[in-house]
């Protein structure tokens, strides 16, 4: 177990990330809030990623720490989970190796989670931020992912049950109380950021900072992509309603196995999501 002597543990899971990794680490080193430690686990890269990590660990001992084990390639999800179960810290942030964090990201996120902990002491809390979507050269595609999609996240966290991915892991900060709710993992756990979202919705609270604080780089090797398309009700899918219901039935069974309640709860949440998205796409950003 790695015990973080600072306030925030930034967990960076990387695989074959030589192209962008140094730029991301440099953006972390440029943060205005300094009370953090970076923990990096390489997932068996075959490029120059291990050498890049080694160089930064030597240049910033105690600030940047390589988490090493003999388990080799775990995959994106389990690489993040391994970091989370290995590091003990008051607060955590997931970090992708191909993004760029704006200088105020850690400070703004930490300030907001502390404000919410004062309002709601002792419970799991997650704070997410907006992000700017860029191409691989950091040319801006969408200044705000949320507004490009017409998706106000505050409308959905009130559901207390999230049948969609609500929080991008790289935008989040969360406290130890939420980390403790993420283990033990079910055998068929979803991706790390979806599991984070689900546990926060189930046991705690989710809050949003309506500022883009990372440059999210879109390129051909992303493990996950930005959801920017504006939601419209899928009228053309009415003919496919039976197959859609079969798919949702399988999804509802999956969430039921994870302990998120009955089928009715899932389908009510889906219906509320559709209604709220129709409202959100017409209003979000107009009053801000």
Feature-to-residue mapping (PLM):
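Terminal low-complexity segments of carbohydrate-biosynthetic enzymes
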Residues: 229-288
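Nucleotide-sugar donor-binding/catalytic module of glycosyltransferases
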Residues: 1-228
């Amino acid at each position: 177990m790695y015990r973080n002597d600072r306030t925030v543990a930034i967990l960076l899971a990387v695989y074959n990330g030589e192209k962008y990794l140094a730029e991301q680490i440099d953006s972390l080193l440029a943060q205005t809030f300094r009370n953090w430690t970076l923990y990096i686990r390489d997932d068996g890269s075959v490029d120059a990623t291990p050498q890049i990590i080694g160089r930064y660990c030597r240049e910033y001992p105690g600030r940047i720490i390589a988490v090493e084990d003999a388990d080799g390639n775990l995959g994106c999800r389990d690489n993040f989970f391994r970091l989370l179960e290995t590091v003990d810290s008051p607060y955590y942030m997931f970090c992708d190796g191909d993004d760029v964090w704006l200088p105020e990201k850690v400070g703004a996120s930490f300030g907001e989670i502390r404000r919410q902990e004062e309002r709601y002491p002792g419970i799991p809390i997650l704070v997410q931020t907006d992000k700017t979507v860029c191409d691989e050269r950091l040319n801006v595609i969408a200044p705000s992912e949320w507004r490009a999609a017409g998706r106000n996240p505050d409308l959905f966290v009130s559901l207390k049950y999230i049948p969609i991915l609500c929080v991008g892991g790289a935008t989040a900060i969360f406290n130890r109380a939420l980390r403790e709710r993420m283990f033990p993992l079910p055998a068929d756990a979803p991706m790390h950021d979806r599991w984070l979202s689900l546990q926060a919705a189930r046991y705690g609270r989710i809050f949003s900072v309506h500022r883009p604080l990372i440059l999210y780089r879109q390129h051909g090797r992303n493990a996950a992509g930005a959801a920017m398309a504006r939601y419209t009700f899928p009228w053309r899918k009415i003919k496919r309603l039976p197959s859609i219901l079969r798919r949702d039935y399988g999804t509802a069974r999956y969430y039921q196995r994870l302990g998120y309640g009955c089928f009715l709860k899932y389908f009510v949440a889906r219906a509320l999501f559709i209604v709220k998205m129709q409202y959100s796409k017409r209003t979000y950003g107009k009053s801000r």
